[in-house]
Regions:
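Active-site-proximal cap/loop segments of hydrolase catalytic domains
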Residues: 1-178
Length: 178
C-alpha cells in the first residue's frame, strides 16, 4: 500500500464523510469522490441528523422590566457542515449530485461549491440531470467512468486513454460460457 496515494469515495452520508475527510486531512488524501453528500446537515433531514449526530441545546434566560423570566431555546447540529472545513481543502475533490434528488437536496452540494469557489479552490463537479438520490442507467455509467478516471489520474498519475473498468466483466464472461 502506498500511503502517499490515498483516495476515498462515499455516497450520501458517505459523500459527506469523503468530502469532510479530504478537507480535514488534505495532506493525507490525494483524491476524494463525493456523490449525493449531505454536506450541510442544517438543511438535511432533521430526524436523521438528531438521531445520528445529536443536537446541542442552548437555553438563554432573560428577565423583563417586571422581573418575569423568559427562556429562549437555540438548537444547533453537533457535526460541522463541510463548508466550515473547506478552508483546509487543497486538491482532488470530485463532487456529484442528482438534479432531482429528494433525499439529499442538491443545495447541500451547492452550498459547499459556493464556499469552494469563493475560496478559489480547485475541484470538479457534475450535476446528473435525470438522477434522484441513486444513479442509474447511462448516468450510473457516466458517474463510474468519471470516478475511476479521477482516481486513475490522481492516484496512478494515469492521464492516458479512457479508463474502461467493468467490474462485472468476468462474471458476464462466465455466464456466457454456461
Amino acid at each position: 500500500i502506498d500511503a502517499t496515494k490515498v483516495g476515498i469515495y462515499g455516497h450520501s452520508g458517505g459523500g459527506f464523510m469523503s468530502a469532510a475527510a479530504i478537507c480535514t486531512y488534505p495532506d493525507f488524501y490525494s483524491a476524494a469522490v463525493s456523490s449525493a453528500g449531505n454536506h450541510d446537515n442544517r438543511i438535511y433531514n432533521k430526524g436523521f441528523v438528531e438521531i445520528h449526530y445529536g443536537v446541542d441545546e442552548k437555553v438563554t434566560t432573560t428577565k423583563d422590566s417586571l422581573g418575569v423570566e423568559s427562556k429562549t431555546y437555540d438548537y444547533s447540529v453537533r457535526v460541522r457542515p463541510n463548508q466550515e472545513l473547506a478552508k483546509n481543502y487543497k486538491h482532488g475533490l470530485l463532487l456529484f449530485t442528482g438534479a432531482i434528488d429528494q433525499t439529499v437536496n442538491p443545495a447541500n452540494t451547492l452550498r459547499l461549491v459556493d464556499v469552494l469557489i469563493k475560496a478559489d479552490k480547485d475541484f470538479d463537479m457534475f450535476v446528473l440531470p435525470k438522477c434522484t438520490h441513486g444513479f442509474f442507467g447511462e448516468s450510473e455509467s457516466f458517474f463510474e467512468h468519471k470516478m475511476w478516471r479521477h482516481f486513475a489520474r490522481l492516484l496512478l498519475h494515469d492521464n492516458s486513454a479512457d479508463c474502461d473498468i467493468d467490474l462485472n466483466k468476468d462474471m458476464i464472461k462466465d455466464e456466457r460460457r454456461r
